[in-house]
């Protein structure tokens, strides 16, 4: 995907788009193990921002991403260089970027989930909604 974006896809100005190959290489084994052996449906992941090519490739292998979007990596209508809930179509759980918010978002989401479960917040709210008024 990164090779295609930098070398095969036509570029009017000849500039390369980058792609952070080392970041992708460093997380490939972990993400492969997670997505194909460990994660359950309810699990959520914040992908290391510079490893989005690995995330998008895995989503393609799972049938959640198109080849055309992979070929258009980092271009209009293609997959994003940082996973984005609003711009990517392949099930990004948390938008991440270069400022490291992914780690904080997953931590706080986990804390909120634990709090609501321990305090039965959701069940209490549903009970109040369903009570005859």
Regions of interest found by a model, annotated:
Residues 3-10, 20-133:
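Cofactor-binding active-site loop characterized by glycine-rich and histidine/acidic residues
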């Amino acid at each position: 995907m990164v090779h295609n974006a930098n070398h095969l896809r036509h570029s009017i100005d000849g500039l390369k788009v980058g792609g952070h190959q080392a970041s992708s290489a460093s997380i490939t084994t972990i993400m492969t193990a997670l997505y194909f052996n460990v994660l359950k449906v309810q699990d959520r992941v914040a992908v290391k921002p510079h490893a989005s090519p690995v995330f998008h490739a895995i989503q393609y292998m799972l049938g959640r991403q198109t080849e055309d979007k992979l070929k258009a990596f980092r271009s209009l209508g293609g997959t994003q260089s940082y996973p984005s809930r609003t711009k990517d179509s392949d099930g990004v759980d948390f938008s991440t970027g270069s400022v490291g918010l992914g780690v904080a978002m997953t931590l706080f989401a986990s804390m909120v989930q634990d709090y609501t479960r321990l305090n039965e917040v959701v069940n209490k709210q549903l009970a109040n909604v369903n009570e005859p008024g």
